[in-house]
Amino acid sequence: MSGARPLTVVVVDDSLTTRALIAAALRRDPRVKIVGTAGTPFEARDLIVRLNPDVLTLDFEMPSMNGLQFLEKIMRLRPMPVVMVSGHLSSHRGLVEQSLRMGAAEWYSKTTTANGEDPFAGLGDAIVRAAAMKQQAPVPVATDSANRTVPKIGTVVGIGASTGGVEALTDVLGHFPVACPPTVIVQHMPRQFSESFARRLDRIVKPEVRLAEEGDMLKPGTVYVASGGERHLRVRCGARSGEYVCQLVAAPPVNGHRPSVDELFYSLATTVGKNAVGVILTGMECDGAQGLLAMRHAGASTIGQDRASSVIYGMPRAAYELGAVETQLPLSAIGPAILNLCERRSLETYP
């Protein structure tokens, strides 16, 4: 690896002594660099999101959540090379095979040798091998989560905007990857401009952007834009457990608007709850403020655009003064913040 960047590693082990021993061993290996250590899966979750390491070493035996449980979450939500570490490898043969099917790249035994050699002397080699392996989708493993009714798609993003929103939405969605969280948008505009707006966004951003239609099932990688003028856009539960769909409702205008941001946000608060992220962007008056407050009360994360970057600081201001905005950010920071919140919420929740 001469001249190559060292592999960044996060070490997860409930034993402070073991973490120190691993750190000491890896400091002697120029091929790797420890960027963080964690004593629990919950600490590890935050480090993974923040540091994006090349490889994770994961202790199999930990309190609160064992290594296999955490491995399942990592491989489903943020696939990466993982080296499972155990002090009793010979007694875990079945679990070794299971973890490899789930996506682990390596198992490493930390048993102390008879001649007193460093039990982690070979861990650097295991990390390098793990990093060299092509990450593949894990084979599904049956768990109790199959019976749960938490939505399979994870977090849903709802965004409301008015004056200045066309440019603001272009900026926010420009940060989204192809496989973005399912996103529903209400942008105040006449009906005749909605379709061309959605087509324009679809051409310039990575996810698919389309006008929302009755019964559209929300899925990752797709952004659903409400058509202006005739009907409100709401999100409701689908016919099958764990699904959300678009609902178009012919009802009177709310706050002088149809579709209304409040209508969308209220539906997300009721249907999606804490698995939602609500965002209110530039626009005049107050549409969306009460709905965003309902989302926050339901446990959702909420973001408001700040005054300096807003064309009209009306809707964001109304929401902020109402206490509906958890975090106020400049426009350029909102897209990355949405993705970060979605990653954190996904790592906190079994689907």
Curated annotation (Swiss-Prot):
Protein source organism: Gluconobacter oxydans (strain 621H)
**KW Ribosomal protein (keyword) present:** no
Gene3D superfamilies, per database record: 3.40.50.2300, Methylesterase CheB, C-terminal domain
List residues of the Response regulatory domain: 8-125
Q: Which PANTHER family does its entry note?
A: PROTEIN-GLUTAMATE METHYLESTERASE/PROTEIN-GLUTAMINE GLUTAMINASE (PTHR42872), PROTEIN-GLUTAMATE METHYLESTERASE_PROTEIN-GLUTAMINE GLUTAMINASE (PTHR42872:SF6)
- List the record's Gene Ontology CC terms alphabetically: cytoplasm
Family statement drawn from the similarity comment of this UniProt entry: Belongs to the CheB family.
HAMAP family for this protein: CheB_chemtxs
**EC number, as in UniProt:** 3.1.1.61, 3.5.1.44
**What InterPro entries does the database record attribute to this sequence?**
CheB-like, CheB_C, CheY-like_superfamily, Sig_transdc_resp-reg_Me-estase, Sig_transdc_resp-reg_receiver
Q: How is it modified after translation?
A: Phosphorylated by CheA. Phosphorylation of the N-terminal regulatory domain activates the methylesterase activity.
Where 4-aspartylphosphate occurs along the chain?
A: 59
One GO biological process from the UniProt record?
chemotaxis
Is Cytoplasm included in the keywords of this UniProt record? yes
Where found?
A: Cytoplasm
Chief location category: cytoplasm
Quote the Pfam families the UniProt record gives.
CheB_methylest (PF01339), Response_reg (PF00072)
Which terms does the record give in the GO molecular function aspect? phosphorelay response regulator activity; protein-glutamate methylesterase activity; protein-glutamine glutaminase activity
UniProt-recorded name of the protein: Protein-glutamate methylesterase/protein-glutamine glutaminase
According to its UniProt entry, what is the function of this protein?
Answer: Involved in chemotaxis. Part of a chemotaxis signal transduction system that modulates chemotaxis in response to various stimuli. Catalyzes the demethylation of specific methylglutamate residues introduced into the chemoreceptors (methyl-accepting chemotaxis proteins or MCP) by CheR. Also mediates the irreversible deamidation of specific glutamine residues to glutamic acid.
Q: Which SMART domains match?
A: REC (SM00448)
NCBIfam families, per the entry: PRK00742.1
The domain section of the record reads: Contains a C-terminal catalytic domain, and an N-terminal region which modulates catalytic activity.
